């Protein structure tokens, strides 16, 4: 889609045109669903966040100033990412626990350097198998490139807690990736 078409869609969205809103949603929903899947474990949560995000996007559209397609994508992605983070924070009150000692014992046995290429599906599966809070922190740090301090501020916790959570997430992911590698070479 060229810039002129996108300018027209954004302009119509600002006026509340539902056809333009549908077009904008269709343009970005698959990419934004992928963003949601990195943070949230269930399709239901992803769909809820995506819906809430686009409702928020359409409400805020009147104050949005179109620059280019890349800026629009970044703006939409930021809103979706923030919605994901807020959803995870709301679920924080639910108890989660990880038997990290069990994983550390396994990791000690398999510290070898792995030269195995993982598919995107394998990586997403591993990421979805770690606790939601650890996944959130890992995504914010590795994918969204937030600093530890920024994550601590956003999640209202200490930098040391974030560092510990990152370490736990890495260990859990490493353990799962080693298991996948071992299954592949059997």
Language-model segments: residues:
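Internal acidic/polar
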Residues: 6, 86, 94-117
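Short, charged helix-capping/linker segments at alpha-helix termini
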Residues: 14-23, 33-52, 159, 182-186
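N-terminal module of bacterial RNA polymerase sigma factors
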Residues: 1-30, 144, 149, 182, ...
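Structural recognition of an alpha-helix C-terminal capping motif at a helix-to-coil junction
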Residues: 34, 48-55, 70-82
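C-terminal edge and immediately downstream basic/flexible tail or linker adjoining helix-turn-helix-like DNA-binding
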Residues: 1-3, 12, 139, 153-156, ...
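Helix-turn-helix DNA-binding module
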Residues: 125-128, 132-136, 144-161
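Arg/Lys-rich amphipathic alpha helix in sigma70-family domain 2
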Residues: 63, 78-98
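Sigma70-family region 2
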Residues: 14-15, 41, 54-69
């Amino acid at each position: 889609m060229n810039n002129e078409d996108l300018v027209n869609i954004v302009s119509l969205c600002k006026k509340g045109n539902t056809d333009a809103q549908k077009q904008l949603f269709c343009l970005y929903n698959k990419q934004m669903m992928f963003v949601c899947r990195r943070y949230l474990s269930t399709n239901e949560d992803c769909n809820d966040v995506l819906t809430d995000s686009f409702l928020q996007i359409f409400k805020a559209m009147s104050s949005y100033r179109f620059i280019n397609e890349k800026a629009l994508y970044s703006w939409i992605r930021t809103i979706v990412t923030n919605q994901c983070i807020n959803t995870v924070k709301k679920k924080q009150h639910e108890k989660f626990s990880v038997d990290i000692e069990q994983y550390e014992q396994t990791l000690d046995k398999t510290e070898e350097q792995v030269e195995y290429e993982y598919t995107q599906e394998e990586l997403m599966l591993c990421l979805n198998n770690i606790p939601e809070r650890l996944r959130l922190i890992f995504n914010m740090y590795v994918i969204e490139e937030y600093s530890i301090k920024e994550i601590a501020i956003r999640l209202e916790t200490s930098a040391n807690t974030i560092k510990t959570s990152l370490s736990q997430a890495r260990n859990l992911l490493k353990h799962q990736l080693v298991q996948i590698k071992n299954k592949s070479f059997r």
